[in-house]
Structure formats: C-alpha cells, structure tokens
C-alpha cells in the first residue's frame, strides 16, 4: 500500500531512501548527501502547467552544506547539476507516489537553462515539477518540466525531464 499524502517531511524522505515509504519494490530517493530536498510541500495528481500532476519541494540552504566547501574554494556555489538531479529525484518520487514499482533511473532532459545561482547566503531553494505525461506500461516513465527557485526567484528551468522505473537494471 502506497503512503499517498500531499506532503512529506525530511524523515519521510529519509524513509524513502531506506525503501520504507513506497514498499520493497517501490523507487527510493537517494540518502544524504545526495538527497537534495528537506520536504515535499505539495503533491497532486492534477494541477501544474499541464494539469497532469504537480510536485513542490524545498531545500533549506545554509553555508555548511557539503558542496559549498568544494565548489568552488573562495567562490562557493551550489552545483547546477545538483538542482537538476533534485528534479529527477522528484519525478521518480512522484512515480512511486502513484504506485509505480522499480528502480528509478534518470533517462534524460530535453533542455536546461541556468539563469541564476544558489549561494551560501540564500535561505531556501524551491523545486516545482509540472507533469506532462505518465507512461504506465512495461516501462513506467514520467515526463515533466521543472523549475528551481532560490528565495522566490526563478534560476533554472528544465524541459522534458524523463525518469523511468525498471524492474531489472542489469542491462541498463
């Protein structure tokens, strides 16, 4: 049985990483340090820009986050690839929320644009995922557009984020 709520706490997300939230066959989020969100504040099967589902999540920023110490020394900035990975994480999480089973794998993105950055002085990153299509056949796949905001300002956009759930990843 899927634990299908409209919001999830940090502990819930950590439980997902241990395989406890969506069952033994459901997709898992990564564990810290690669878990790129502190909470999911909204999940719906409708809504978003295409009325096919919406997820909103947040990451609290503080200067002690691991990536600021190494990217870059003297010029700390959150790597843009981590924001992109967070969006893929949320697409996979949504597929598990819908009841999908399998191991989540990012399959690509059509276009990504960076128009800003996350600095250690920021307070909060918000991720918004707008689902365009869910494929539920032999392969379960989500297709979505995403946005990353820092302190309410749009800084990244991603079009055609793709994540699939696989029963067997040995040939992937």
UniProtKB/Swiss-Prot annotation:
Q: Which InterPro entries match?
A: FabA, FabA_FabZ, HotDog_dom_sf
Q: Name one GO biological process term.
A: unsaturated fatty acid biosynthetic process
Annotated active site residues, numbered on this chain, are 71
Nucleotide-binding as a keyword of this entry, yes or no, is: no
Enzyme Commission number(s) from the entry: 4.2.1.59, 5.3.3.14
The record's annotation in SUPFAM superfamilies points to:
Thioesterase/thiol ester dehydrase-isomerase
Give, as in the UniProt entry, the pathway in which the protein acts: Lipid metabolism; fatty acid biosynthesis
The molecular function terms of the Gene Ontology recorded here are:
(3R)-hydroxyacyl-[acyl-carrier-protein] dehydratase activity; trans-2-decenoyl-acyl-carrier-protein isomerase activity
Q: Name one Pfam family in it.
A: FabA
Q: Where is the protein situated, by its record's location annotation? A: Cytoplasm
Q: Which reaction does it catalyse?
A: a (3R)-hydroxyacyl-[ACP] = a (2E)-enoyl-[ACP] + H2O; (3R)-hydroxydecanoyl-[ACP] = (2E)-decenoyl-[ACP] + H2O; (2E)-decenoyl-[ACP] = (3Z)-decenoyl-[ACP]
Q: Recite the UniProt keywords alphabetically.
A: Cytoplasm, Fatty acid biosynthesis, Fatty acid metabolism, Isomerase, Lipid biosynthesis, Lipid metabolism, Lyase
Q: Does the keyword Oxidoreductase apply?
A: no
Q: Which GO terms describe its cellular component?
A: cytoplasm
- Which domain of life does the protein's organism represent? Bacteria
Record family assignment? Belongs to the thioester dehydratase family. FabA subfamily.
Q: How does it assemble?
A: Homodimer.
- Spell out the HAMAP family in the cross-references: FabA
Sum up the protein's function in the record's words.
Answer: Necessary for the introduction of cis unsaturation into fatty acids. Catalyzes the dehydration of (3R)-3-hydroxydecanoyl-ACP to E-(2)-decenoyl-ACP and then its isomerization to Z-(3)-decenoyl-ACP. Can catalyze the dehydratase reaction for beta-hydroxyacyl-ACPs with saturated chain lengths up to 16:0, being most active on intermediate chain length.
According to UniProt, the name of this protein is 3-hydroxydecanoyl-[acyl-carrier-protein] dehydratase
Query: By which gene is this protein encoded?
Result: fabA
């Amino acid at each position: 049985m899927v634990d299908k709520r409209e919001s999830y706490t940090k502990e819930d997300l950590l439980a997902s990483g241990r395989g406890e939230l969506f069952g033994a066959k459901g997709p898992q989020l990564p564990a810290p340090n690669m878990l790129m969100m502190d909470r999911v504040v909204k999940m719906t099967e409708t809504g978003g820009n295409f009325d096919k589902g919406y997820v909103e999540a947040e990451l609290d920023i503080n200067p002690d986050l691991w990536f600021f110490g190494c990217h870059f020394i003297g010029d700390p900035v959150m790597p843009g690839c981590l924001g992109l990975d967070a969006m893929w994480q949320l697409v996979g999480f949504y597929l598990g929320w819908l009841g999908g089973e399998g191991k989540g794998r990012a399959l690509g993105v059509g276009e990504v644009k960076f128009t800003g950055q996350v600095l250690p002085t920021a307070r909060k990153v918000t991720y918004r995922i707008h689902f365009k299509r869910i494929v539920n056949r032999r392969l379960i796949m989500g297709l979505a557009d995403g946005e990353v905001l820092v302190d309410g300002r749009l800084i990244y956009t991603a079009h055609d984020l793709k994540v699939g759930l696989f029963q067997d990843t040995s040939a992937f």
